[in-house]
């Protein structure tokens, strides 16, 4: 009896959905199921009509948005021309990953589940709603859901009687092998370009532009709790162009001290070079990784040793461990019953993969190099809103970066990999180059002259609006209204002098909210409500566009509630009509958001 064919497709923004998908793949193979795990946008979506059994694993980002690596699939699957019987041969299940503190919790998974039903698919289970806010994380929902899933899958597709279920402790072969070279290659392996890429092509993830850093300036007061940087890059000769609302992606690196510590813990020679080979046909090597590559470069620029490891990290370490006590503890962390203890040890204090390896020294020293890419995720690029316009700053690109640093119960402060790396770079001490490329963002501004724009950007959320205002002022457009919020005027009022100069010229209406300068906190939504008549007149009378950028947790919902109250009180709309009015603004792209966690 041939084994059933299972396809796992994932859409992942931070790597969690990919990690869950690979876990699904391992568990399927334990059950003798033929299984492929693929990124949604890499899979030829028209082939779904031939798939009998598909598990979709998808995260929800921002305000109910799909991850970047499933956006093409998302557009295709919601085409109105698709027939209602298109997927009638397919059994499916949807596993969602989200955060219940956001208004559109697991919106992508829920909407995909409904759409697959509309196209004739048969759901094996209700959609799984993994929640980052749960004390045990998404696994609290995933573990029982997977038990039900395998029962459903193995009903119509039972394990052949002559085959046994592989025990969970079996060590599967690594995805890749590292072939170490006897001699150091002579052809410049440290150039930042992946083998086989076209150096003449436009800057991209495969071929980033090494942009010289021109300046790195702290723009918050010395006593302010947060270090925020205005960083400028020279993009002359790069071929990079961008518009207001676009994003720049930056590929960060691990610190030299962490790289050295990692190599010592695993007994690796950082100067040794290797080539990477896939173990199975059909598996491709990471496209960004050069061939050949040094161990130092692999650890510095590719392996995310500063990430908080997921459950699969502990499962694999347990399989690799030769030390009985360490192995038992790792098995506990990797098991369903050990998730509360894992949360206490790792997730809650944000302990990094490097710190875990140092806590399990006998295991770390026994990790075969072939398993490095199975054990650790690749460093992901970080996206920043571009904070300048080429019209105002030709050949320059500026970003506003809040340096992430916070304390947990661990002795060492937790630091954001990319923001801390950028903050550490000082062009005054010598040339600094940063790998970057640009992509279209989620905000598009009106091309028609004289269309007013209302922009709400508290904190670093103001960055894309500075680019938009510079661009619009250069084109002679004066209908710019900016609501900016921060803690104190003298500590974190970004670009104060620039805004005041534009306001004096009649190019900008600036409305500020300084939350800590009076006994009762004042936020942007309070200032928005106070100017309700102006907001309603601009939106309903003059066809203004409304933009919102900043932290996704509470502010967007508060601003939307404020808008609804303005529509009711200034426009005389009923509750349903106010909600419909806001929905219409969203549909026509007159209400746009760019938010982040």
Curated annotation (Swiss-Prot):
Q: Where in the cell is it found?
A: Cytoplasm, Perinuclear region
An annotated GO BP: iron-sulfur cluster assembly
The UniProt record gives the binding positions of FAD as 350, 382-385, 416-419, 596
Any idea where the FAD-binding FR-type domain is? 206-446
The record's listing under SUPFAM superfamilies reads: Ferredoxin reductase-like, C-terminal NADP-linked domain, Flavoproteins, Riboflavin synthase domain-like
Which superkingdom, per the lineage?
Eukaryota
Cofactor(s) listed: FAD; FMN
Got any disulfides in this one, which pairs? Answer: none
An example of a Gene Ontology cellular component annotation for this protein is: perinuclear region of cytoplasm
Indicate which residues the UniProt annotation says bind FMN: 12-17, 59-62, 97-106, 132
Give a yes or no for keyword NADP in this entry. Answer: yes
Keywords from the named record: Cytoplasm, FAD, Flavoprotein, FMN, NADP, Oxidoreductase
GO function terms (MF aspect): electron transfer activity; flavin adenine dinucleotide binding; FMN binding; NADP binding; NADPH-hemoprotein reductase activity; NADPH-iron-sulfur [2Fe-2S] protein oxidoreductase activity; oxidoreductase activity; oxidoreductase activity, acting on NAD(P)H, heme protein as acceptor
Which enzyme type, at the first EC level? oxidoreductase
Describe its function: NADPH-dependent reductase which is a central component of the cytosolic iron-sulfur (Fe-S) protein assembly (CIA) machinery. Transfers electrons from NADPH via its FAD and FMN prosthetic groups to the [2Fe-2S] cluster of CIAPIN1, another key component of the CIA machinery. In turn, this reduced cluster provides electrons for assembly of cytosolic iron-sulfur cluster proteins. It can also reduce the [2Fe-2S] cluster of CISD1 and activate this protein implicated in Fe/S cluster repair. In vitro can fully activate methionine synthase/MTR in the presence of soluble cytochrome b5/CYB5A.
Task: Give the family, as the similarity comment puts it.
Answer: Belongs to the NADPH-dependent diflavin oxidoreductase NDOR1 family. In the N-terminal section; belongs to the flavodoxin family.
Output this protein's name.
Answer: NADPH-dependent diflavin oxidoreductase 1
Q: Which organism is it from?
A: Bos taurus
Q: Which gene encodes it?
A: NDOR1
